[in-house]
Amino acid sequence: MSNPDATHPSGVPHRELGRTREKVSAIGLGGWHLALPHVDEPLGIRIVRRAIDEGITFLDNSWDYNDGASETRMGKAPRDGYREKVFLMTKIDGRSKKEAARQLDESL
């Protein structure tokens, strides 16, 4: 098994995520702020890409942040070669199997 506490060249520590064997940054970037009224889409995408360039590889979001706009922007940012560098995570709050499935479909 690889060193679970390896450090990215940027200095950001990376660890294995649970049993996945995926290495992710110990610090993540949350997506809620990416679609606030004063953050336009190009700025939101620049924020995500800058975080990735600096060694942040764990991106956290939720299907209902800013009516889905945050997730949409975070989904656009990893284009152009960035997708292979990140681990995307989203949250749902559905309390039934049907609602959880709907939210996951909406997220994808």
Which residues does each PLM region occupy?
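N-terminal binding-site loop/beta-alpha segment at the start of enzyme catalytic domains
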Residues: M1-K85
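A short, structured active-site edge motif that brings together acidic residues
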Residues: E84-S96
